[in-house]
Regions:
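Hydrophobic, well-ordered secondary-structure elements that form the walls
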Residues: 78, 103, 156-160
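Generic non-transmembrane alpha-helix signal with a bias for helix starts/N-cap capping motifs
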Residues: 96-97, 166
Length: 166
């Protein structure tokens, strides 16, 4: 079991489907069984999964994350609410890439990778202190000077946990 399909791809496993609301999945020597414990009245998928945690090569809640309509629409809406003049739109990689693309699409301001992310530094929001979070952030992102120097930049960040990267 996994919260997104990329985990299955990594081990060449078959994706069967999502765990339903109110459903229990039992895997034992007899195989896999599904049991509906209760029927929830309303479906409320985790917003963090869709806009923050999920990898772009996954399917969650029945929809591909890549070119996520939700993530791109956030960027489009951001431009509509806060239009500005700039030379480039830069995401804080990787989870805000789609939102930055949406901002770029709506504004017609070119999208550029002006920050390079180290994939050796993990999630920063889980660190227990702000000092540790700040230390990891400095090591996690490096400005791409060839892209950003002398430019007016719209920096798009979707960090909704602590807002530390800004």
């Amino acid at each position: 079991m996994a919260s997104e399909t990329a985990a299955f791809d990594a081990v060449n496993a078959k994706y069967i489907g999502e765990v339903g609301r109110g459903e229990l999945i039992i895997v034992d020597k007899n195989g896999l069984r599904r049991k509906q414990l209760y029927q929830p009245e309303e479906s409320l998928p985790c917003v963090f999964e869709h806009i923050y945690f999920s990898r772009p090569d996954s399917i969650i809640f029945g929809s591909p994350v890549a070119n996520s309509v939700i993530r791109r629409e956030f960027g489009r809406q951001l431009y509509r609410i806060h239009p500005t003049k700039a030379d480039i739109v830069v995401p804080v990689p990787d989870s805000s890439n789609d939102a930055a693309l949406g901002y770029s699409d709506e504004s017609r301001i070119p999208f550029e990778f002006g920050l390079i992310r180290s994939h050796y530094i993990g999630r920063t929001f889980i660190e227990p202190t702000q000092t540790l979070r700040d230390s990891k952030i400095v090591r996690k992102f490096n400005p791409n000077r060839a892209v950003i120097d002398g430019k007016r930049i719209v920096l798009v960040d979707d960090s909704i946990v602590r807002g530390s990267t800004m």
